[in-house]
Amino acid sequence: MSTPTLQTGHVGLNVTDLARSIAFYRQVFDFEVVREQTTGDRRYALLGREGTLMVTLWQQSGGAFATDRPGLHHLSFQVPDVEAVHRAEKVLRELGATLVYDGVVPHGEGASSGGVFFTDPDGIRLEIYAPSGAGAAPAPTQGAPTCGFF
């Protein structure tokens, strides 16, 4: 019996303020709103690109994302090149987003892959990275992937 090929579908995130989160994810990731319900008790938004659903936002939580609890560690998005990472970094700085490290950093010592690490308005840890082009700067963590310890 062969195992069918799997790929990640969409990722669902709980948020505290749907309108704020929709604006953030649209500006940072250039997502389109595929469908949304912004009134009533069941508020949500389905976000994607070119008809492909990528992230769902559910307004059904309070407080901030708890990084010390089991669950999502971080959500990562790959872009084609490091120039796209720098463009995202510029948008993040314009929005006043919290950057975990100063600018684009490699995933590890000697790695050419790397990106920008940041949090959304609810403290959910996010990453935008390129598979190459980030190797000139020193890695911010030693002996482990940068993306694992932020």
Predicted regions and their residues:
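Vicinal oxygen chelate
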Residues: S2-P4, Q7-D17, A45, A66-F150
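Short, solvent-exposed loop/turn elements at beta->coil junctions and helix N-caps
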Residues: R43, G62-G63, G103-G108
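Alpha-helical elements of the RecA-like P-loop NTPase motor core of helicases
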Residues: I22-A23, H86, L126
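Residue-level structural signal for beta-strand termini and adjacent loop
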Residues: T39, Q59-Q60, V105, P131
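Core segments of cupin and vicinal oxygen chelate
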Residues: L13-V55, Q59
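Short beta-strand/turn micro-motifs at beta-sheet edges
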Residues: M1, Q60-F65
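Short coil/turn motifs at secondary-structure junctions
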Residues: G62, P80, P131-G133
